[in-house]
Amino acid sequence: MKNKILIAVTLFVCTVASSCNNWLDVTPQAQVNADKLFSTPEGYESAVYGIYTAMTDASIYGTHMTFGFMDVLAQYYYASWDKSHNLYECSQYHYNNGTTQNLISNLWLKSYNTIANCNVLLERLKGQSPSFFPEGEYNLIYGEVLALRAFLHFDLLRAFAPSWNVDKEALCLPYADNFGDKIYRQKKTTEIVRALIHDLDTARILLKPVDRAVQDEFKDMYNHYVTDADNVFLSARAYRMNYWAVTGLLARVYHYMGDPKAYTYANEVIQALRDGYFQFTPESALSAPVKTRDVIMQNEVLFALNYSGIHDLWYSYDASTTTDYEIDGVSRLYPSGDDFRGQYLVTAGKAGYEVSIKYADVKSDKGGKIPMIRLSEMFLIAAESGFDQDKENAIALLEELRLNRGIGAEISATISAEKFREELTIEARREFLGEGQMFYWYKRLGLPVGLDEIEVSPATFCLPLPATEVEFGNRTEDYIKN
């Protein structure tokens, strides 16, 4: 039984081919002979690609932890007004509703299943010699998978636990840091964050010397996406959990805590922009015909999931049914007619409602991707985290982001901290549409949700644990308090 990964922990594998996008083509298997899989470096590579593909499942980042459930909770859509909408109950925070319970349960199970696959791979790596791999690949895989495990845990923490400011000592979630059949105990938020940061710090150390994403050749945008036929795995680094993505994730974690270190990590990524590793998206790339439009602003992406079928799950470009994601309040969200996002990334669907085209069926390398961490978030984090220390710089960062979105209005030098946070919040809402981040922003700050400012209690900000976890896993939900 040791050498089988059974249905409870389905290991996703795929074949590495010569194209940087071929890791999308994955065959899930109910059970895989682990010894055979991990008998070659290519087997380890396939297991890494399989983790990414598992993350594109509709129950998590393929839909519900991005543009689906999490953005419904953030009140982006008309779902909150339409009782016939299949996600109406979710929009009302009716967590006891059957549909909502199923979404939450599947989100939990698939996330921890994917974490288990990370742990299977990490356990195998511990028993393998670095010399078994091409030079540098052992550290690359180890760092990458450590960071992916941290990424998954952090989103579970943000979704289910009280915010850091409400109760950082809450006994809330398991941190599954090894593979086994034991029931992991719930840990305090502080314990989980400490484990997250340890994993991410380790990942950065492992990745920096070997990751092509930090080499000078990466300053040529073409090299973000080109692959080396001799080693596809080492060369296709643009969207994977690379060094910059790990740095951005650390900024996100410290921002969640309200720790000034958030500025340090966010600023490191911003400096990478200054040094040529990233580029803001010009209007010409956004105003191109829809089929070739840069809908995800690819040169600003730190981490994304490749998923060629995303447009099949995102019905909005052909909006006509109750499963669509019609945006509520577009004119209020993008009041400036000059805002590139309002001009080029939102359109009218068949039913006449305005919808995003971020996941439209774009027939180019600019589509079929789900942004997980982007450059713009680093500007928002640095601006908020650095406001008290350097107000002028914080204002300049927000103005720079807005200028690169077509908004030229200056921000008053006398703006208050409260008003500045309001400006950051609306800018975040414009940026994060379809990406599942905005609900966490409101929760972190304890703000009313959406353009209509719906009051949400601390308890409602916490997703309830699946009933099976409480009943059979001996979990407590005592931390969920009004």
Segments predicted by a language model, with ranges:
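Bacterial Sec-dependent N-terminal signal peptides
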Residues: M1-Q29
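Membrane-proximal, proline-rich intrinsically disordered regions
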Residues: C20-D71, Y307, A409, P448-N482
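Aromatic-residue-lined binding/catalytic grooves and analogous aromatic/hydrophobic interfacial grooves
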Residues: N21, R212-Q215, Y243-F278, I480-K481
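Conserved, well-structured interaction surfaces
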Residues: E45, H85-F160, K182-T190, I205-L207, ...
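Inward-facing hydrophobic residues that define packing positions of alpha-helical scaffold repeats
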Residues: V48, I115-C118, V193, L200, ...
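Hydrophobic-face positions in mid-chain alpha helices that act as interaction patches
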Residues: F218, Y222-A229, F233-M241, P260-L375, ...
